[in-house]
Amino acid sequence: MWLQQRIKVFPGLLSSSWARRVLAVSGFLVIIYWYIFSGSHYRSFWYSGKQWGVSGACLQAQIVQWKTLAEKGDVVMVSFPGEEIKLQGPAMVGNGQIIVDVGKNNLWVSSLSVLFHLTNYSPLTLFKNVGALAETHATAIFLKEGLIRTIRCLQVEASDSPRDCVTVREDHFAHRSRPHVYVQNIHITNPSDRVVTFDISSQKPLTGETFSTSLEKVQEKQFLLSSGRVSVEDGKIILVVVATKKLASRLQVSPKSEHDETVLSVVYASEPIDPAKLSDTFSKLRENAKKEMFELMHMKTEDLFHEHQQIWSDLIVSGIEMKKITDLHTPSRDTINITLYYMLSCSLAPLVDPALSNEEREKMESFLNYADHCFTGHSSMHAENLWPGSLSGITQLLQLWDLWKLTLQKRGCKSLVSAGAHGLMQGMLLSFGGLQFTENHLQFQSDPHVLHNSYSLRGIHYNKDLINLAVLLDQDEKPFLHVSVKFQDKLVKLYACEAGCLNEPVELTSEVRGHIFPVLITQPLTPLLYISTDLTHLQDLRHTLHLKEILAHEEHMAKQYRGLPFLFWFSVASLITLFHLFLFKLIYNEYCGPGAKPLFRSKV
């Protein structure tokens, strides 16, 4: 009976416009709450199970490790079905000589005297399945391997089992030690009971001047040779020649089998030339491309990839790892990783060029091992234009590359920039941490106000050794410094001391546990850490810094933020007092002043 009475009340409540508005707003807030806090897991299940069907479930099984690698910072997701993940920049591979925009199927070329220019050549070879019922794909950049990987899952027969889907894995990379080589490796797995057919083609440009293509043959080896031109300023042109492995127009993969295909491309571009020199220049480029293509076709794919990965691994020995970010202006881990990847992909690596003379190599290595006066000025950690959260395309990416080189050159790192990709990585590392080489030592001069962030800088070159420096936080959120060394050559003693060098310098060792230094702030402000091979130099620093005081980091920050000034609080207290006096006056005049109304009415 009581329940029936309560139910009868609801129509009356809903008849009120105010009640209907409250109900609508409450429902909207519930939907928003569900979408934010539980939507990602549900959407992942929905996409993988219902909306994407069998091919989606197959893809989930294929890339189950990608998310783990992404959490470690080894992979940057480009596209992933069912998740709101999209790379805020171009999906590209490069080596300083060529750039391949995998997402847009564009080829960019450069030469010694000119920066990158967009060509009208489409470098990707397309493998399209004939008769697939459904297809799902995902793409990611593998930072430690220097490549872009795409996995496609194809449902080719009416089956409810994801295990019957055909899987196509494509790897794209611009070879790091062979600057003219671009590789596209395709691996197809067909677990189904039917033959799977793929049409093989290359995308033709819709507008602009097309590349002319001819069939070349060198000692029973056939490949395609394409040539075209790029117009530049002053009426000159850049001639581009591309040699590509010749493939059949159709591929059939047998049931219960696998197939591997490696598409090799050799790209040569000329310096800007007058059109009158076109014929001679084409002959030279053609011979160079044919020679290198012939050499590549006699190599194993595994050896080619091993060459690339070995050089790329050497480049990323150095790096930046964000452990904890506590403010909005510090770039995220993914932003830092993808920026480093982009800058390396745009830069040549002359140190791995076999044509480099021993004298030039020793000179570049000396720059890399001790970059005197680099990096001067404040840290680049919070420079949002150097660590952008998004890039619109290759053009903006190249502008960022120019800005990084200009910044490093103006901050004392010109010698590092001349060392190519290895030097650029080192310069970016020094700039992020506020590290500077002087005549006798390496100093860490980070702003004390940014030490609430936890991060590590690995692979800092000091002579031929590698130093790892980390800013970490203890249980009370107080920062401290952790330093370790990885000796590369003969043992050379390294010493370090914290700000002021009042304590005896500590000899750095290669022990895994490393060495811990407190964060001390001096007045006047001096570097937080000194590292040197000269023990006497560090011992002398304490007598030459002429400091007024040395405080722990938390004491320094407490002095910087002593709270609001006395005048502010006095003003607030005065306003509160005046308000209450005014309120008291109103009440007094109402009941006690002239013409005041009586508090109680008379009964008569």
Swiss-Prot record:
It is a single-pass type I membrane protein. Its main location: membrane. GO terms for cellular component: membrane. Pfam families: DUF2152. Residues 585-604 are cytoplasmic. Residues 1-40 form the signal peptide. Glycans are attached at N337. The chain crosses the membrane at residues 564-584. The keyword Transmembrane helix applies. Residues 41-563 are extracellular. Keywords: Glycoprotein, Membrane, Signal, Transmembrane, Transmembrane helix. It is found in: Membrane. PANTHER family: SIMILAR TO RIKEN CDNA 2510039O18, UNCHARACTERIZED PROTEIN KIAA2013. This is Uncharacterized protein KIAA2013 homolog. It comes from Xenopus laevis (African clawed frog).
